[in-house]
UniProtKB/Swiss-Prot annotation:
Annotated InterPro entries: Ribosomal_uS2 (IPR001865), Ribosomal_uS2_bac/mit/plastid (IPR005706), Ribosomal_uS2_CS (IPR018130), Ribosomal_uS2_flav_dom_sf (IPR023591)
GO cellular component assignments: cytosolic small ribosomal subunit
One GO BP annotation of this record: translation
Keywords: Ribonucleoprotein, Ribosomal protein
Domain of life: Bacteria
Protein's name according to its UniProt entry: Small ribosomal subunit protein uS2
Family, similarity comment: Belongs to the universal ribosomal protein uS2 family.
Keyword Ribonucleoprotein on entry: yes
Pfam families in alphabetical order: Ribosomal_S2
Amino acid sequence: MSVISMKQLLEAGVHFGHQTRRWNPKMKRYIFTERNGIYIIDLQKTVKKVEEAYRTMRDIAAEGGDILFVGTKKQAQEAIKEEATRAGMYFVNQRWLGGTLTNFQTIQKRIKRLKDIERMQEDGTFEVLPKKEVVQLKKELERLEKFLGGIKDMKGLPSALFIVDPRKERIAVAEARKLHIPIIGIVDTNCDPDEIDHVIPANDDAIRAVKLLTSKMADAILETKQGEETVTA
């Protein structure tokens, strides 16, 4: 039983690449043809690459590894948050803060601040503080939660990154490569596939395409967790 079908990919519009004038020649091997000035991705290759990525995600999760889902473009934000949460993993779906990986200690200090304010809100501290101060703290909490909420329980560096549109997330890609953290990525015809360890050639601009592929990666993680539950039961 294959992980994904050609029909699913077609229905989600995974095969539509970018305009031919906006392309990276390194993606040529994943392009099937050109139609009306748009590159059409070879979905047979996508099927194989999804299966490879699925196995990789499953193996990392089976070894107890954490995977960080990254996608800050509008088309990816919702799917990244939903699927990472469903899989019990971490995510960045707003702005990638420089140093999230390469300067993780500093990021952890910001996360500690986030948790401290949350605690103050929960234990009644807000009720005894001046109103003006509470307003400021709530604003700070909102901002920290927006950018760090998806990684606030991440204790250390992730074992791998799953990225939607490595061109958009080039800082995340650079940080992961510097630290030799493997990257699984949805790579469109305008991206450089050489920077990604496990390439999924696909349309990264259609919400349905991003949702479909991201959900398959979450399924891979959940498959191992269900296996663990069966063993413990």
